[in-house]
Amino acid sequence: MFRGATAVNLDSKGRVAIPTRYRAEILEKNQGQMVCTVDIRQSCLLLYPLDEWEKIEQKLLALSNFDPTQRRLQRVMLGHATECEMDAQGRILLSGPLRQHAKLEKGLMLVGQLNKFEIWSDVEWHTQIAEDIEIGSSTDFAADALNDFSL
């Protein structure tokens, strides 16, 4: 399970180091194999351990090729999906198109979302968090979507 937001750096070759606290789990369950793709709603990347990605692939496979919206989702998610293998130093290589989509430069944020990571430009991340907090403070959290949620 991946939790928390960690500042990491992208090196000159496009590699990012997975924080040490997550490496053993990724190696044990997935032999260091991960899949990275784009987020369809925001300018970040989604990084899945291989076993979690395989669940997503099955869901995408079940979508209709004849429904334009479902087909677009398949095209974007699968079309950008790139296998990433952790090297001996715990780094993964992010392809150029993925880095471009998320506007990645040197400073990144690796954000745990339990079954996956989001990878953000540090600038985009801080902007997004500020917006989320602002919207959250002006939103009625008693909305139906959160009725059964408690902290």
UniProtKB/Swiss-Prot annotation:
Pfam families in the record: MraZ
PROSITE patterns: SPOVT_ABRB
Subcellular localization: Cytoplasm, Nucleoid
Main subcellular location of this protein, as a coarse class: cytoplasm
GO cellular component: cytoplasm; nucleoid
InterPro entries per UniProt: MraZ (IPR003444), MraZ_C (IPR035644), MraZ_dom (IPR020603), MraZ_N (IPR035642), MraZ_sf (IPR038619), SpoVT-AbrB_dom (IPR007159), SpoVT-AbrB_sf (IPR037914)
Occurrences of domain SpoVT-AbrB (ranges): 5-52, 81-124
SUPFAM superfamilies: AbrB/MazE/MraZ-like
Keywords from the UniProt entry: Cytoplasm, DNA-binding, Repeat, Transcription, Transcription regulation
Biological-process GO terms, alphabetical: negative regulation of DNA-templated transcription initiation
Gene Ontology MF term list: DNA-binding transcription factor activity; transcription cis-regulatory region binding
Assembly notes: Forms oligomers.
Family the entry assigns: Belongs to the MraZ family.
NCBIfam families: division/cell wall cluster transcriptional repressor MraZ (TIGR00242)
The protein's name in its UniProt record: Transcriptional regulator MraZ
Underlying gene: mraZ
